[in-house]
Amino acid sequence: MTTHNICALITEFPLVKRLIDLEEVVWFNPNITTLEEGLPYVGLGAANIKDASERLKRFAPYLMKAFPETAASNGIIESNVVEIDKMKSCLEAQYGTQILGRLMLKKDSHLPISGSIKARGGIYEVLTHAERLAIEAGLLNESDDYSKLFSEEFRQFFQQYSIAVSSTGNLGMSIGIMSAKLGFSVSVHMSSDAREWKKNKLRSHGVNVVEYEQDYGVAVEQGRKEAEKDPTCFFIDDENSQTLFLGYSVAGERLKQQFDDMGIIVDAEHPLFVYLPCGVGGGPGGVAFGLKMAFGDHVHCIFAEPTHSPCMLLGVHTGLHDDIAVQDLGIDNITAADGLAVGRASGFVGRAMERLLDGYYTITDERMYHHLGELSEQEDIRLEPSALAGMMGAVHVSQDQAYQARMQFSEDKMNNAIHLVWATGGGMVPEAEMSAYLAKSGR
Protein backbone atom coordinates (compact mmCIF):
# COMPACT_ATOMS: atom_id res chain seq x y z
CA MET A 1 0.00 0.00 0.00
CA THR A 2 1.48 3.37 -1.02
CA THR A 3 1.93 6.30 1.33
CA HIS A 4 -0.76 8.11 -0.65
CA ASN A 5 -3.23 5.25 -0.16
CA ILE A 6 -2.46 5.06 3.56
CA CYS A 7 -3.09 8.80 3.93
CA ALA A 8 -6.41 8.44 2.10
CA LEU A 9 -7.38 5.53 4.36
CA ILE A 10 -6.54 7.55 7.48
CA THR A 11 -8.56 10.51 6.17
CA GLU A 12 -11.59 8.26 5.75
CA PHE A 13 -10.96 6.21 8.90
CA PRO A 14 -9.01 8.28 11.49
CA LEU A 15 -8.90 5.29 13.84
CA VAL A 16 -6.37 3.67 11.47
CA LYS A 17 -3.75 6.26 12.50
CA ARG A 18 -4.07 5.09 16.09
CA LEU A 19 -3.64 1.48 14.99
CA ILE A 20 -0.48 2.46 13.08
CA ASP A 21 0.78 4.22 16.22
CA LEU A 22 0.22 0.94 18.13
CA GLU A 23 -2.17 2.61 20.54
CA GLU A 24 -4.68 0.62 22.55
CA VAL A 25 -7.92 1.29 20.70
CA VAL A 26 -11.57 0.53 21.53
CA TRP A 27 -14.24 0.59 18.82
CA PHE A 28 -17.89 -0.31 19.33
CA ASN A 29 -19.39 -0.78 15.87
CA PRO A 30 -22.43 1.50 15.39
CA ASN A 31 -23.57 -0.61 12.42
CA ILE A 32 -24.42 -3.80 14.27
CA THR A 33 -27.86 -5.29 13.77
CA THR A 34 -30.17 -7.95 15.15
CA LEU A 35 -29.57 -11.68 14.77
CA GLU A 36 -32.57 -11.85 12.43
CA GLU A 37 -31.06 -9.25 10.09
CA GLY A 38 -27.45 -10.41 10.42
CA LEU A 39 -27.90 -14.18 10.16
CA PRO A 40 -28.41 -14.36 6.35
CA TYR A 41 -24.88 -12.96 5.87
CA VAL A 42 -23.39 -15.89 7.81
CA GLY A 43 -24.81 -18.47 5.41
CA LEU A 44 -25.16 -21.03 8.21
CA GLY A 45 -27.89 -21.70 10.75
CA ALA A 46 -29.24 -23.81 13.60
CA ALA A 47 -29.36 -26.98 11.46
CA ASN A 48 -25.61 -26.73 10.79
CA ILE A 49 -24.82 -26.39 14.50
CA LYS A 50 -27.12 -29.34 15.30
CA ASP A 51 -25.30 -31.44 12.70
CA ALA A 52 -21.93 -30.57 14.29
CA SER A 53 -23.24 -31.28 17.78
CA GLU A 54 -24.60 -34.69 16.72
CA ARG A 55 -21.30 -35.60 15.04
CA LEU A 56 -19.36 -34.80 18.23
CA LYS A 57 -21.78 -37.00 20.20
CA ARG A 58 -21.21 -39.88 17.74
CA PHE A 59 -17.46 -39.59 18.28
CA ALA A 60 -17.70 -39.39 22.10
CA PRO A 61 -17.25 -43.18 22.64
CA TYR A 62 -14.13 -43.09 20.45
CA LEU A 63 -12.69 -40.06 22.26
CA MET A 64 -13.20 -41.74 25.64
CA LYS A 65 -11.06 -44.66 24.48
CA ALA A 66 -8.44 -42.68 22.58
CA PHE A 67 -8.09 -39.97 25.24
CA PRO A 68 -8.96 -41.36 28.70
CA GLU A 69 -8.84 -37.81 30.11
CA THR A 70 -12.19 -37.21 28.35
CA ALA A 71 -13.89 -40.11 30.17
CA ALA A 72 -15.04 -37.88 33.06
CA SER A 73 -17.10 -35.83 30.57
CA ASN A 74 -18.24 -38.94 28.63
CA GLY A 75 -16.09 -38.07 25.62
CA ILE A 76 -17.44 -34.53 25.28
CA ILE A 77 -14.69 -31.90 25.03
CA GLU A 78 -15.93 -29.05 27.23
CA SER A 79 -14.57 -26.55 29.77
CA ASN A 80 -15.73 -25.10 33.08
CA VAL A 81 -17.07 -21.62 33.77
CA VAL A 82 -15.80 -20.04 36.99
CA GLU A 83 -16.45 -16.74 38.74
CA ILE A 84 -13.33 -14.58 39.19
CA ASP A 85 -14.50 -12.09 41.80
CA LYS A 86 -11.04 -11.33 43.21
CA MET A 87 -9.81 -10.50 39.72
CA LYS A 88 -12.83 -8.25 39.26
CA SER A 89 -11.95 -6.29 42.41
CA CYS A 90 -8.36 -6.07 41.21
CA LEU A 91 -9.41 -4.64 37.81
CA GLU A 92 -11.80 -2.17 39.44
CA ALA A 93 -9.07 -0.84 41.72
CA GLN A 94 -6.47 -0.75 38.97
CA TYR A 95 -8.58 1.11 36.41
CA GLY A 96 -10.75 3.17 38.77
CA THR A 97 -13.87 1.68 37.21
CA GLN A 98 -16.84 -0.04 38.77
CA ILE A 99 -17.70 -3.22 36.84
CA LEU A 100 -21.41 -3.79 37.39
CA GLY A 101 -22.52 -7.42 37.27
CA ARG A 102 -20.42 -10.59 37.61
CA LEU A 103 -17.03 -11.36 36.03
CA MET A 104 -16.53 -14.97 34.93
CA LEU A 105 -13.92 -17.00 33.06
CA LYS A 106 -14.56 -19.69 30.42
CA LYS A 107 -11.65 -22.09 30.80
CA ASP A 108 -11.08 -23.32 27.25
CA SER A 109 -7.46 -22.99 28.39
CA HIS A 110 -8.00 -26.29 30.19
CA LEU A 111 -9.89 -28.23 27.51
CA PRO A 112 -8.69 -31.85 27.31
CA ILE A 113 -6.39 -33.17 24.56
CA SER A 114 -4.74 -29.88 23.54
CA GLY A 115 -5.46 -27.28 26.25
CA SER A 116 -6.91 -24.51 24.10
CA ILE A 117 -10.03 -23.24 22.31
CA LYS A 118 -8.63 -24.92 19.18
CA ALA A 119 -9.60 -28.29 20.68
CA ARG A 120 -13.12 -27.33 19.57
CA GLY A 121 -12.72 -26.51 15.87
CA GLY A 122 -9.47 -28.31 15.11
CA ILE A 123 -10.48 -31.66 16.51
CA TYR A 124 -13.96 -31.35 15.00
CA GLU A 125 -12.63 -30.81 11.48
CA VAL A 126 -10.30 -33.83 11.74
CA LEU A 127 -13.17 -36.00 13.01
CA THR A 128 -15.45 -34.77 10.20
CA HIS A 129 -12.83 -35.69 7.59
CA ALA A 130 -12.17 -39.09 9.18
CA GLU A 131 -15.89 -39.88 9.31
CA ARG A 132 -16.35 -38.96 5.66
CA LEU A 133 -13.43 -41.15 4.52
CA ALA A 134 -14.57 -44.14 6.60
CA ILE A 135 -18.20 -43.89 5.45
CA GLU A 136 -17.18 -43.54 1.79
CA ALA A 137 -15.01 -46.66 2.15
CA GLY A 138 -17.94 -48.62 3.58
CA LEU A 139 -16.19 -49.08 6.93
CA LEU A 140 -18.53 -46.96 9.05
CA ASN A 141 -22.21 -46.07 9.39
CA GLU A 142 -23.55 -43.17 11.42
CA SER A 143 -25.52 -45.67 13.54
CA ASP A 144 -22.32 -47.55 14.56
CA ASP A 145 -20.56 -47.39 17.90
CA TYR A 146 -17.68 -45.10 16.92
CA SER A 147 -15.37 -46.60 19.54
CA LYS A 148 -14.59 -49.16 16.81
CA LEU A 149 -12.40 -46.45 15.23
CA PHE A 150 -9.93 -47.02 18.07
CA SER A 151 -8.44 -50.08 16.41
CA GLU A 152 -5.46 -51.14 14.34
CA GLU A 153 -7.76 -51.74 11.36
CA PHE A 154 -8.83 -48.10 11.27
CA ARG A 155 -5.33 -46.80 12.00
CA GLN A 156 -4.06 -48.69 8.96
CA PHE A 157 -6.94 -47.32 6.87
CA PHE A 158 -6.22 -43.71 7.86
CA GLN A 159 -2.46 -44.19 7.30
CA GLN A 160 -3.19 -44.05 3.56
CA TYR A 161 -4.16 -40.39 3.97
CA SER A 162 -2.47 -37.26 5.20
CA ILE A 163 -3.59 -34.00 6.80
CA ALA A 164 -1.82 -30.64 6.75
CA VAL A 165 -2.46 -27.37 8.56
CA SER A 166 -0.68 -24.06 9.07
CA SER A 167 -0.65 -22.62 12.56
CA THR A 168 0.87 -20.19 15.04
CA GLY A 169 0.63 -23.00 17.59
CA ASN A 170 -2.63 -24.09 19.19
CA LEU A 171 -4.57 -25.09 16.07
CA GLY A 172 -1.57 -27.14 14.99
CA MET A 173 -1.50 -28.84 18.40
CA SER A 174 -5.18 -29.80 18.21
CA ILE A 175 -5.11 -31.01 14.62
CA GLY A 176 -1.72 -32.68 14.94
CA ILE A 177 -2.54 -34.66 18.09
CA MET A 178 -5.99 -35.71 16.85
CA SER A 179 -4.83 -36.68 13.35
CA ALA A 180 -1.88 -38.70 14.63
CA LYS A 181 -4.08 -40.54 17.13
CA LEU A 182 -6.44 -41.65 14.35
CA GLY A 183 -3.51 -42.82 12.23
CA PHE A 184 -3.18 -40.05 9.65
CA SER A 185 0.21 -38.87 8.45
CA VAL A 186 0.13 -35.22 9.54
CA SER A 187 2.23 -32.12 8.84
CA VAL A 188 1.91 -28.87 10.78
CA HIS A 189 3.39 -25.79 9.12
CA MET A 190 4.47 -23.52 12.00
CA SER A 191 5.08 -19.79 11.67
CA SER A 192 8.09 -18.05 13.23
CA ASP A 193 6.18 -17.03 16.37
CA ALA A 194 5.18 -20.60 17.32
CA ARG A 195 6.50 -21.66 20.73
CA GLU A 196 9.25 -24.28 20.83
CA TRP A 197 7.41 -26.40 23.41
CA LYS A 198 4.39 -26.68 21.11
CA LYS A 199 6.62 -27.95 18.30
CA ASN A 200 8.25 -30.46 20.67
CA LYS A 201 4.89 -31.72 21.92
CA LEU A 202 3.73 -32.29 18.34
CA ARG A 203 6.91 -34.17 17.46
CA SER A 204 6.40 -36.39 20.52
CA HIS A 205 3.07 -37.44 18.97
CA GLY A 206 4.76 -38.34 15.67
CA VAL A 207 3.74 -35.16 13.86
CA ASN A 208 5.92 -33.71 11.08
CA VAL A 209 6.60 -30.08 12.05
CA VAL A 210 7.61 -27.77 9.19
CA GLU A 211 9.17 -24.54 10.48
CA TYR A 212 9.17 -21.11 8.80
CA GLU A 213 11.14 -17.97 9.50
CA GLN A 214 8.15 -15.89 8.35
CA ASP A 215 4.73 -15.21 9.86
CA TYR A 216 1.41 -17.05 9.75
CA GLY A 217 0.41 -15.82 6.27
CA VAL A 218 3.51 -17.39 4.69
CA ALA A 219 3.01 -20.65 6.63
CA VAL A 220 -0.54 -20.88 5.25
CA GLU A 221 0.54 -20.18 1.69
CA GLN A 222 3.37 -22.73 1.79
CA GLY A 223 1.31 -25.33 3.64
CA ARG A 224 -1.43 -25.10 1.04
CA LYS A 225 1.10 -25.44 -1.82
CA GLU A 226 2.70 -28.52 -0.27
CA ALA A 227 -0.71 -30.15 0.30
CA GLU A 228 -1.74 -29.55 -3.33
CA LYS A 229 1.13 -31.79 -4.48
CA ASP A 230 -0.36 -34.80 -2.66
CA PRO A 231 -3.80 -36.05 -3.81
CA THR A 232 -4.27 -37.96 -0.53
CA CYS A 233 -3.62 -34.82 1.55
CA PHE A 234 -6.40 -32.77 3.16
CA PHE A 235 -5.39 -29.18 3.95
CA ILE A 236 -7.28 -27.58 6.83
CA ASP A 237 -7.73 -23.91 6.01
CA ASP A 238 -8.08 -21.81 9.17
CA GLU A 239 -8.84 -18.71 7.11
CA ASN A 240 -11.90 -20.02 5.26
CA SER A 241 -13.08 -23.31 6.77
CA GLN A 242 -16.79 -23.48 7.57
CA THR A 243 -16.20 -26.87 9.20
CA LEU A 244 -13.77 -25.39 11.73
CA PHE A 245 -16.20 -22.51 12.29
CA LEU A 246 -19.03 -24.96 13.07
CA GLY A 247 -16.84 -26.96 15.44
CA TYR A 248 -16.39 -23.80 17.51
CA SER A 249 -20.07 -22.85 17.24
CA VAL A 250 -21.25 -25.80 19.35
CA ALA A 251 -19.84 -23.88 22.35
CA GLY A 252 -22.95 -21.67 22.35
CA GLU A 253 -25.51 -24.34 23.22
CA ARG A 254 -23.03 -25.91 25.66
CA LEU A 255 -22.60 -22.60 27.52
CA LYS A 256 -26.38 -22.12 27.61
CA GLN A 257 -26.71 -25.51 29.29
CA GLN A 258 -23.97 -24.63 31.79
CA PHE A 259 -25.68 -21.35 32.61
CA ASP A 260 -29.03 -23.14 33.02
CA ASP A 261 -27.38 -25.58 35.44
CA MET A 262 -25.87 -22.63 37.36
CA GLY A 263 -29.18 -20.76 37.49
CA ILE A 264 -27.81 -17.91 35.36
CA ILE A 265 -30.40 -16.06 33.28
CA VAL A 266 -29.57 -14.32 30.00
CA ASP A 267 -32.36 -12.14 28.60
CA ALA A 268 -33.18 -8.50 27.80
CA GLU A 269 -32.81 -7.55 31.48
CA HIS A 270 -29.75 -9.77 32.07
CA PRO A 271 -27.24 -9.09 29.26
CA LEU A 272 -24.25 -11.32 28.58
CA PHE A 273 -20.96 -9.78 27.42
CA VAL A 274 -18.34 -12.15 26.02
CA TYR A 275 -14.73 -11.12 25.41
CA LEU A 276 -12.92 -13.26 22.83
CA PRO A 277 -9.23 -13.07 21.84
CA CYS A 278 -8.98 -12.93 18.04
CA GLY A 279 -6.24 -14.07 15.66
CA VAL A 280 -7.36 -14.94 12.12
CA GLY A 281 -10.93 -15.06 13.46
CA GLY A 282 -12.14 -18.64 13.00
CA GLY A 283 -12.24 -19.57 16.69
CA PRO A 284 -13.84 -16.42 18.11
CA GLY A 285 -16.04 -16.04 15.03
CA GLY A 286 -17.41 -19.56 15.34
CA VAL A 287 -17.93 -19.25 19.10
CA ALA A 288 -19.65 -15.86 18.64
CA PHE A 289 -21.94 -17.37 15.99
CA GLY A 290 -22.86 -20.21 18.35
CA LEU A 291 -23.46 -17.75 21.20
CA LYS A 292 -25.73 -15.62 19.01
CA MET A 293 -27.72 -18.70 18.00
CA ALA A 294 -28.04 -19.76 21.66
CA PHE A 295 -28.74 -16.39 23.32
CA GLY A 296 -29.95 -14.22 20.43
CA ASP A 297 -29.66 -10.45 20.79
CA HIS A 298 -29.03 -10.72 24.54
CA VAL A 299 -25.36 -11.71 24.05
CA HIS A 300 -22.81 -9.08 23.08
CA CYS A 301 -19.52 -10.38 21.66
CA ILE A 302 -16.37 -8.26 21.67
CA PHE A 303 -13.07 -9.27 20.02
CA ALA A 304 -9.66 -8.50 21.53
CA GLU A 305 -6.41 -8.30 19.53
CA PRO A 306 -2.77 -7.37 20.20
CA THR A 307 -1.77 -3.80 19.27
CA HIS A 308 0.80 -5.32 16.89
CA SER A 309 -1.75 -7.61 15.14
CA PRO A 310 -5.11 -5.79 14.90
CA CYS A 311 -6.18 -7.55 11.69
CA MET A 312 -9.90 -8.08 12.38
CA LEU A 313 -10.46 -4.57 13.75
CA LEU A 314 -8.64 -3.15 10.72
CA GLY A 315 -10.54 -5.32 8.23
CA VAL A 316 -14.02 -4.72 9.64
CA HIS A 317 -13.55 -1.02 10.46
CA THR A 318 -12.35 -0.16 6.94
CA GLY A 319 -14.63 -2.69 5.21
CA LEU A 320 -11.55 -4.07 3.41
CA HIS A 321 -11.54 -7.36 5.36
CA ASP A 322 -8.87 -9.71 3.91
CA ASP A 323 -7.94 -7.19 1.21
CA ILE A 324 -5.72 -5.46 3.77
CA ALA A 325 -3.04 -6.73 6.16
CA VAL A 326 -1.55 -4.92 9.15
CA GLN A 327 1.85 -5.10 7.42
CA ASP A 328 0.44 -2.90 4.62
CA LEU A 329 0.38 -0.12 7.22
CA GLY A 330 3.85 -0.86 8.58
CA ILE A 331 2.55 -2.72 11.65
CA ASP A 332 4.99 -5.58 12.34
CA ASN A 333 2.63 -8.39 13.52
CA ILE A 334 5.12 -9.36 16.23
CA THR A 335 3.52 -10.16 19.59
CA ALA A 336 4.02 -12.39 22.63
CA ALA A 337 0.42 -13.51 22.09
CA ASP A 338 1.53 -16.16 19.60
CA GLY A 339 -1.99 -17.45 18.92
CA LEU A 340 -3.07 -13.95 17.87
CA ALA A 341 -0.07 -13.09 15.67
CA VAL A 342 -2.03 -12.80 12.43
CA GLY A 343 -1.68 -9.91 9.98
CA ARG A 344 -4.60 -10.63 7.66
CA ALA A 345 -8.03 -11.57 9.03
CA SER A 346 -10.33 -14.25 7.65
CA GLY A 347 -12.47 -12.60 4.99
CA PHE A 348 -15.11 -15.26 5.53
CA VAL A 349 -15.43 -14.55 9.26
CA GLY A 350 -15.22 -10.76 8.91
CA ARG A 351 -17.91 -10.58 6.27
CA ALA A 352 -20.11 -13.21 7.94
CA MET A 353 -20.01 -11.79 11.46
CA GLU A 354 -19.35 -8.03 11.23
CA ARG A 355 -23.03 -7.14 11.81
CA LEU A 356 -23.23 -9.38 14.88
CA LEU A 357 -20.12 -8.31 16.82
CA ASP A 358 -20.58 -5.38 19.20
CA GLY A 359 -17.00 -4.23 19.28
CA TYR A 360 -13.25 -4.70 19.07
CA TYR A 361 -10.27 -3.48 21.08
CA THR A 362 -6.51 -3.81 21.08
CA ILE A 363 -4.22 -4.55 24.01
CA THR A 364 -0.45 -4.36 24.51
CA ASP A 365 1.71 -7.39 25.29
CA GLU A 366 2.73 -5.66 28.53
CA ARG A 367 -0.88 -5.46 29.69
CA MET A 368 -1.54 -9.10 28.79
CA TYR A 369 1.49 -10.16 30.85
CA HIS A 370 0.38 -7.91 33.70
CA HIS A 371 -3.07 -9.54 33.79
CA LEU A 372 -1.47 -12.98 33.46
CA GLY A 373 0.38 -12.35 36.71
CA GLU A 374 -2.66 -10.86 38.43
CA LEU A 375 -4.93 -13.78 37.52
CA SER A 376 -2.34 -16.24 38.78
CA GLU A 377 -1.97 -14.29 42.03
CA GLN A 378 -5.66 -13.51 42.62
CA GLU A 379 -7.37 -16.68 41.38
CA ASP A 380 -4.55 -19.25 41.09
CA ILE A 381 -5.35 -19.71 37.38
CA ARG A 382 -2.43 -19.74 34.94
CA LEU A 383 -2.93 -18.91 31.28
CA GLU A 384 -0.73 -18.13 28.28
CA PRO A 385 -0.45 -14.42 27.31
CA SER A 386 -2.94 -14.48 24.41
CA ALA A 387 -5.65 -15.88 26.71
CA LEU A 388 -5.54 -12.67 28.76
CA ALA A 389 -6.49 -10.45 25.82
CA GLY A 390 -10.14 -10.58 26.88
CA MET A 391 -9.52 -9.43 30.45
CA MET A 392 -9.84 -5.71 29.63
CA GLY A 393 -13.24 -6.15 27.99
CA ALA A 394 -15.39 -5.57 31.06
CA VAL A 395 -13.39 -2.42 31.85
CA HIS A 396 -13.94 -1.02 28.36
CA VAL A 397 -17.68 -1.78 28.39
CA SER A 398 -18.00 -0.24 31.86
CA GLN A 399 -16.16 2.93 30.81
CA ASP A 400 -17.93 3.52 27.49
CA GLN A 401 -21.06 5.47 28.37
CA ALA A 402 -21.87 6.18 24.71
CA TYR A 403 -21.99 2.46 23.91
CA GLN A 404 -24.16 1.74 26.95
CA ALA A 405 -26.55 4.58 26.03
CA ARG A 406 -26.82 3.51 22.37
CA MET A 407 -27.57 -0.06 23.39
CA GLN A 408 -29.95 1.10 26.15
CA PHE A 409 -28.06 -0.69 28.91
CA SER A 410 -29.54 0.88 32.04
CA GLU A 411 -27.79 0.68 35.41
CA ASP A 412 -30.25 -2.04 36.45
CA LYS A 413 -29.41 -4.10 33.36
CA MET A 414 -25.67 -3.66 33.94
CA ASN A 415 -26.09 -4.75 37.56
CA ASN A 416 -27.62 -7.98 36.21
CA ALA A 417 -24.92 -8.48 33.57
CA ILE A 418 -22.51 -11.38 33.16
CA HIS A 419 -19.07 -10.47 31.79
CA LEU A 420 -17.43 -13.64 30.43
CA VAL A 421 -13.73 -13.65 29.55
CA TRP A 422 -12.98 -16.50 27.13
CA ALA A 423 -9.64 -17.96 28.23
CA THR A 424 -8.29 -19.48 25.03
CA GLY A 425 -5.17 -21.39 26.09
CA GLY A 426 -2.50 -22.13 28.65
CA GLY A 427 -3.52 -25.31 30.44
CA MET A 428 -0.68 -27.34 28.91
CA VAL A 429 2.11 -24.76 29.11
CA PRO A 430 5.23 -26.42 30.63
CA GLU A 431 6.22 -25.25 34.12
CA ALA A 432 9.46 -23.59 32.97
CA GLU A 433 7.62 -21.65 30.26
CA MET A 434 4.94 -20.54 32.73
CA SER A 435 7.61 -19.40 35.18
CA ALA A 436 9.07 -17.23 32.42
CA TYR A 437 5.62 -15.76 31.72
CA LEU A 438 5.12 -14.97 35.40
CA ALA A 439 8.58 -13.39 35.60
CA LYS A 440 7.66 -11.11 32.68
CA SER A 441 4.44 -10.18 34.46
CA GLY A 442 6.43 -8.92 37.42
CA ARG A 443 4.94 -11.57 39.69
Curated annotation (Swiss-Prot):
Its EC number is 4.3.1.18. The keyword Lyase applies. It is an enzyme of class 4 (lyase). The modification N6-(pyridoxal phosphate)lysine is found at K118. PROSITE patterns: DEHYDRATASE_SER_THR. Gene3D superfamilies: 3.40.50.1100. GO terms for biological process: D-serine catabolic process; isoleucine biosynthetic process. Keywords: Lyase, Pyridoxal phosphate. InterPro entries: D_Ser_am_lyase, Ser/Thr_Dehydratase, Ser/Thr_deHydtase_PyrdxlP-BS, TrpB-like_PALP, TrpB-like_PALP_sf. Its cofactor is pyridoxal 5'-phosphate. It catalyses: D-serine = pyruvate + NH4(+). One of its GO terms (molecular function) is pyridoxal phosphate binding. NCBIfam families: D_Ser_am_lyase, PRK02991.1. Belongs to the serine/threonine dehydratase family. DsdA subfamily. This is Probable D-serine dehydratase. It comes from Vibrio campbellii (strain ATCC BAA-1116).
